[in-house]
């Protein structure tokens, strides 16, 4: 894959997010569980396509990060999709270990029940 | 559900997106297909919880919109989750008709194959 060429053909609509030019990256496993959502700048996208492993852009640390660089919980890219208006990509990955830094399989492990935030084992906190 | 109280308990981290205070809203069907991702301001979230139907915030039109208000393709809220850092919600909905204004079931119907953008019937363009 010619990464420069692919990124051009994606015709992405970068958004002004926290003062940076970013797109949304939704990451799912092969069973369609949503693992996380994060941001990507063009460099993070290129690194992802070049290496085959997910890279994101951290708005708080203002830098590129390779998912799992400290925890070892890397995400191997399998395939990806673009949405209709081009400001979001959906990545299907093979998740090593867990996606969430809080130790849960998915970052979406807080369920809202009866108006309360509850950590739940249901649906998004397990494979 | 006391909507004001629930929104407070969600303890959301609104992001500066296109100059507005917004969160990310990922919407999936009951089979875990990702239908779309859009933005919500606090008003859109409250309207969603009050009415039981998805409302988003359009950054281009700079206004609240009720999903399906013109097409009739409304999204009935079933349940929802918050992510670990509080800048995103994941909504599980019952989708009437199709989610995408281009006529596809999901907005993520462009697959990237061999570096090319292809409209695909696979995975995200059908139930």
Swiss-Prot record, chains A, B:
Assembly description: Homodimer.
Coiled coil start-end: none
Keywords assigned by UniProt, alphabetized: Amino-acid biosynthesis, Cytoplasm, Histidine biosynthesis, Hydrolase, Magnesium, Metal-binding, Zinc
Source lineage: Archaea, Methanobacteriati, Methanobacteriota, Methanomada group, Methanococci
Protein name stated in the entry: Phosphoribosyl-AMP cyclohydrolase
Family annotation (InterPro entries): PRA-CH, PRib_AMP_CycHydrolase_dom, PRib_AMP_CycHydrolase_sf
Pathway named in the protein's UniProt entry: Amino-acid biosynthesis; L-histidine biosynthesis; L-histidine from 5-phospho-alpha-D-ribose 1-diphosphate: step 3/9
Family: Belongs to the PRA-CH family.
Molecular function terms, GO-annotated: magnesium ion binding; phosphoribosyl-AMP cyclohydrolase activity; zinc ion binding
Reported function: Catalyzes the hydrolysis of the adenine ring of phosphoribosyl-AMP.
HAMAP family named in the record: HisI
Subcellular location field: Cytoplasm
Cofactor: Mg(2+); Zn(2+)
Protein species of origin: Methanocaldococcus jannaschii (strain ATCC 43067 / DSM 2661 / JAL-1 / JCM 10045 / NBRC 100440)
Cross-referenced Pfam families: PRA-CH (PF01502)
One of the protein's GO biological processes: L-histidine biosynthetic process
């Amino acid at each position: 894959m010619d990464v420069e060429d692919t990124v051009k053909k994606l015709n992405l609509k970068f958004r002004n997010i926290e003062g940076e030019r970013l797109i949304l990256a939704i990451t799912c496993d092969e069973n369609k569980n949503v693992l996380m959502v994060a941001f990507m700048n063009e460099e993070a996208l290129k690194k992802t396509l070049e290496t085959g492993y997910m890279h994101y852009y951290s708005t708080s640390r203002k830098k590129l990060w390779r998912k799992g660089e400290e925890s070892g919980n890397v995400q191997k890219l399998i395939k990806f999709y673009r949405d209709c208006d081009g400001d979001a990509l959906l990545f299907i990955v093979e998740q090593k270990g867990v996606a969430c830094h809080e130790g849960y399989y998915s970052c979406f492990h807080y369920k809202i029940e009866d108006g309360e935030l509850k950590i739940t084992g249901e649906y998004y906190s397990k494979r």
